[in-house]
Structure formats: structure tokens, C-alpha cells
Amino acid sequence: MRSHYCGDVNKSHVGQEVTLVGWVNRSRDLGGVIFLDLRDREGLVQVVYDPDLPDVFDVASSLRAEFCVQVKGVVRPRPDSQVNSQMKTGEIEVLGKALTIINAADPLPLSLDNHQNNSEEARLKYRYLDLRRPEMAQRLIFRAKVTSFVRRFMDGNGFLDIETPILTKATPEGARDYLVPSRTYKGQFFALPQSPQLFKQLLMMSGFDRYYQIVKCFRDEDLRADRQPEFTQIDIETSFMTSDQVMETTERMIRNLFLELMNVDLGDFPKMTWDEAMRRFGSDKPDLRNPLELVDVADLLKAVEFAVFSGPANDEEGRVAALRIPGGAELSRKQIDDYTKFVGIYGARGLAWMKVNNLAAGVEGIQSPVAKFLNEDIIKEIIARTKAADGDIIFFGADKANVVAESMGALRLKAGEDFKLLEGEWRPLWVVDFPMFEKADGRFYAVHHPFTAPRGVTAAELEASPGKAVSDAYDMVLNGVELGGGSVRIHNGDMQSTVFRILGIDDEEAKEKFGFLLDALRFGTPPHAGLAFGLDRLVMLMTGASSIRDVMAFPKTTTAACPLTNAPGHANPDQLVELGIAVLPKEPKQD
């Protein structure tokens, strides 16, 4: 039906007859000549219809937005005054000789030009229209190029594309599972995989050595802008490779990806320990474009007569950190109050501050409600450590270390945006040496997952001091977004059982939930390691989209619903009976 894509017609085709198909992007009658912008996935081309062909001209006059049409015509150069350098096809136009309406279009329920006025609900309900917008189409085309590159790279480096099951068994991986009832085993359920973690480890135990898969994963969790109930991972696992070798291979893939698709050289990725990232940036995924850093000042404040500072300064689990913002002395009291409310979202109970108005004036040049609690030497040392200058403001976070990290880390990001401090376009890094466990509610939880190997300890040493253990794990971070995370896996049955016990999973529960894994570990398991990238986040970053929904063809809403298909929906009652399932009525709300 066509000879060329609309966006591919160029000066080399001048004089040629072309056949194009696509949608009417815009049609306008200018002095008896009709100009038609025809659009397909590759772009736009201008088609001109003269009244010399009255039958064709009449058809062109009847066109409205989003009619699906076929055009036949001859390519010609545009007059110099009409060349459009903003269009890929802006040097040429097609003189229309024939026109066929393939399918008419009703008036649209949403605007494809002024899409900012469309609600998110409408965009998802009429997703097939929203995806016609060039911006959306180009993102999905770019996504296809990313997956094509990944497959070529993986294939070229000896990795095998192997599928793993979608119907599997529920395992504790941090989020709720989507459950699928079994008809043949009434009362029992499959789970949709949160990741192929255990199956890819079993593939290493099976001897396949290098595996990858671009795979759907499912998590029934509360949604945010960067979360979806179903998402896509670039999943990788290797045998007989160290963590450094896995990082080298996957870093090379991402660097080559950016170079090929965006002509961007990311350079070598620096490595930073988890401790350093949390201390300097208050985050395990720091945005290095932001030059602001947290500075520890607790040692200066242990003896001050201000409990807000001295309390955390003398608490083993506490921290007092300072954050200097260049030019921040211009902030009004209301703006400071707004920042105080902002850090309160992250658990902070307040936000002390100090404006540096005139260093030459000594203490008199400092403006702060807490200055009266600090002697001149302390103030001078705080200014020296933070490298504050005239016109700066210093904010203080004082609380438990985790609260300070989260609240001041968030303030660092917000201030960096508000004061337009971000430097450079792309700043990747590796974050390594994560804690093996974190403690909450009197028990230990795995920071990554229960199959991550500790670094440099025996099973006995791990069990004796789990809170001190460091995992052989690594996260790739780009511009404050975790692109992917991985680790060396446990390949020893005793170590795996020890980790289960530390996590409160006794031998009986471990056998019931992970018996197949523990069995497999008895038969010559190779050392193995891997990593998984979030494809949606990667494409979101590379295309500059504001949400992963804008790089997915048919995403869900923030309430995990699909307005297009009205999913989820009610099941057929007969099917529920066959499955042995009864739906309980909603309990009435208690007054």
C-alpha cells in the first residue's frame, strides 16, 4: 500500500512518484490550495492538492484530523520561502495526484495537539490515540532500539536468551504477589514472578553459564510515578564471574548503548561505597550532578546547651549534618518555613538554619535562631567545614541517622533544583558494599534479597554478627535513578540456611518455600552473580520522559487500573465456582 514512510521522504526522491499512507495530522485550505500534513510513525510530510484535479481536490476538502488515508503524488522541492528546517521532511513536499480515504475518524475525545490539557485518565482510556502523537511514538520506537541493542550486545558476549516461568510459586521478596488460582489444585495458587531471581540461579546451577532475558515482572505494591504493577527487566546472570567482572560487562553495555543511540560518552563509572553515599548525599542513589553535600558536625555539638543538637550528637544512632546552599541567604522566612515543612514529610522534626551575611564581621555577620547556643569557635568551624561564603545559608538536620539521611538527602535534591545548581547532563556511578541486613521491628531484613552473598565472612561469622555484615552487592545509578542492581549470589547451602535463620525463616519454613533451591545447592553449584536493569526507567531517563508510563505502550494508572480495557473486572460466577473461590462482600465502614 505504500512505497515510503512519510518521515523518510527527502530531497533524493525529488521527481519520483511515491505512495504514502498515514493519518491526517492537519489540513488547511489556503487560497484554493489544500495543504495536508500526513503522519505515520516515522514523521510528517506535507502534501499539496491543487484544484486542477477537481475529484481529488473534493476528497481532500472533506478530510478531518486523524482520517486514515492513502496518498499518491510526486515529490518536489519546496519554494525557498517555505522550507521548514524544523521538519525532517521540511525541504520537500508531495504534489498529490490521487487520494483514498481508507477510514474516516469521528471527532476526537482528546486533543493530540494540546495534549497538556488531556487528563491522565483520558490519555490511558484512548491510549491508541495518545500513542499517535509523535512524541509518544518516538519514545516507543526508541525503546525498541534499546531492546534491540541489548539483545545484540548480550548475544555477542556469549549470553543465552532463556525464558523462565510466569506461573510460579510465591516467595517472600518484599512486595505482595499477584496470585493466580489453580483450577486443578483447588485452594492453591500460583504467583506471578516479582523477578526471575531463583530460576536464573537454577539456570547457572544447570550449567548455562551466561543468561539474559528481557522479561515482564509483577508486583502488587503501592504505586508512584516510577512504579507499575507490571514492568520490564533486562535480567542477567553469570557463572564464574566476580562482582567486578559483572560490573565491567554491564557498564560496557550501558556505555555502548548511550554511545550508539544518543552519541553520548558516559566515560568510566566511578565506584562509591554505600557508607560514603549515605554520609555525603543522604542517599544510596546519589545524583552527582548536584554539587551539594552533607557535612558531619556532630563532634562539634556534643557539649552545646541545645538538646536538639546535643541529643543526636551524643547518640550512637544519631547524626547532626549540615547542608550549605550557595546564595541561600536570600531565602525569606516563609521560604525557610516551606523547607521545614518539606523535610517534615521525611520524618524531620525541624530544620535549624544559619545565614552567612558577612564573614568579615565575625559572629555579628551570622544570622540564626540557634547561634546563641554556639560559641564563636564552633560557628567558625561549621563555616570552614561547609566552605560557606557570604550569601550562603546552612541548614542542619539533627535526629536518628536514618532520618537525617532521608530528610537532608531530600532537601539536598530539592535545593539543587530550586537554585538551579545541577552540573552536567549525565553522571553515572556504581554504589557498592551495601549492608547485608537492616533491622526494623526487632528483626533483620535483607537489604537486597535473601540470596545475596556476604563479602568476606564465613557462615559462622555472619550468624555471630549479622548487623556488621557487608553484602557483595552493587547498584548502577544514573542522575539519581537506580538503573539496575545486582549481587554475587550465595552458592553454599550452609550459608543460605544461615541467612534464612537470620531473617527469621526457620528450617521448616525454608524447606517449604525454598526446598528446591536448598536441594540444588547440594549438587556442585558454581559461584554465580547477576544484575537486573529496569528497562522502563532506563528508557525514561534516556528519552527525558517524566514518568515510566510515557515509555510503556499500555500502562496502568496509579491505582493499578487500565481505563482502556476496564481491567481489573469481575470474574464470571461459574468460573469462580470452578476455581473454588468465593468473593467476600466488602465490610461496612465503622463509624
Swiss-Prot record:
InterPro entries xrefs: Aa-tRNA-synt_II, aa-tRNA-synth_II, aa-tRNA-synth_II/BPL/LPL, Asp-tRNA-ligase_1, Asp-tRNA-ligase_1_N, Asp/Asn-tRNA-synth_IIb, AspRS_core, GAD-like_sf
Aspartate: annotated segments: 197-200
Record's GO cellular component terms: cytoplasm
HAMAP family reported for this sequence: Asp_tRNA_synth_type1
Designated name of the protein: Aspartate--tRNA ligase
Binding site for L-aspartate: 173, 219, 448, 489
Main location: cytoplasm
Species of the source: Shewanella amazonensis (strain ATCC BAA-1098 / SB2B)
Function description: Catalyzes the attachment of L-aspartate to tRNA(Asp) in a two-step reaction: L-aspartate is first activated by ATP to form Asp-AMP and then transferred to the acceptor end of tRNA(Asp).
GO molecular function, one term: nucleic acid binding
This protein's UniProt keywords: Aminoacyl-tRNA synthetase, ATP-binding, Cytoplasm, Ligase, Nucleotide-binding, Protein biosynthesis
Enzyme class: ligase
Catalytic activities: tRNA(Asp) + L-aspartate + ATP = L-aspartyl-tRNA(Asp) + AMP + diphosphate
Entry EC number(s): 6.1.1.12
Family indicated by similarity: Belongs to the class-II aminoacyl-tRNA synthetase family. Type 1 subfamily.
A Pfam cross-reference name: tRNA-synt_2
Binding site for ATP: 219-221, 228, 482, 534-537
Subcellular location: Cytoplasm
GO BP terms in the entry: aspartyl-tRNA aminoacylation
Gene (name only): aspS
Subunit relationships: Homodimer.
